Regions:
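Juxtamembrane loop-transmembrane helix junctions in multi-pass integral membrane proteins
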Residues: 2, 34-42, 63-66, 70
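Interfacial loop at the N-terminal end of multi-pass membrane proteins
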Residues: 21-47
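Juxtamembrane "helix-exit" motif on the non-cytosolic side of transmembrane helices
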Residues: 24-31, 87-92, 116-122
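Core segments of alpha-helical transmembrane spans in multipass integral membrane proteins
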Residues: 40-63, 76-84
Length: 123
């Protein structure tokens, strides 16, 4: 089992759970995923659709990890953007933000550059 396969499997479990919870049980997602740091809005369901899409693409990544590497790159970019532009300013200002999500994102941003196969296609 490759590192990419492990990451795709983790995506299926974690992003799948967040996606399903956010789409069908948004109030629970508000309490658990974003740790009561935001008021309920339909944005929770929008984010749920996004995360469920990551999970579904990751299912394909279990079978074709090289072809689905762009999913991992996308995760690296959006998580790496969210941390300095959302989590860090909130932390510095003493404002609430989902710390569990921030820690998970931080781990992923550190791990993903070592998991992504940076070789050009065909190598």
């Amino acid at each position: 089992m490759t590192a990419a396969t492990i990451v795709f499997a983790a995506n299926v479990i974690v992003a799948g759970w967040i996606g399903v919870t956010s789409l069908w049980f948004p109030e629970q997602a508000r309490r658990t995923v974003v740790e009561d740091t935001v008021a309920y809005s339909e944005t929770i369901r929008l984010v749920g659709a996004f995360w469920l899409t990551i999970a579904l693409l990751s299912v394909a990544g279990l079978f074709w990890p090289r072809s689905l590497q762009p999913v991992l790159l996308f995760q690296l970019l959006y998580k790496g953007t969210w941390l300095p532009f959302v989590a860090l300013p909130a932390y510095r200002a003493g404002l609430p933000f989902p710390t569990g999500m921030a820690l998970f994102f931080l781990v992923w941003v550190v791990v993903l550059p070592f998991v992504i196969d940076w070789r050009p296609a065909g190598w």
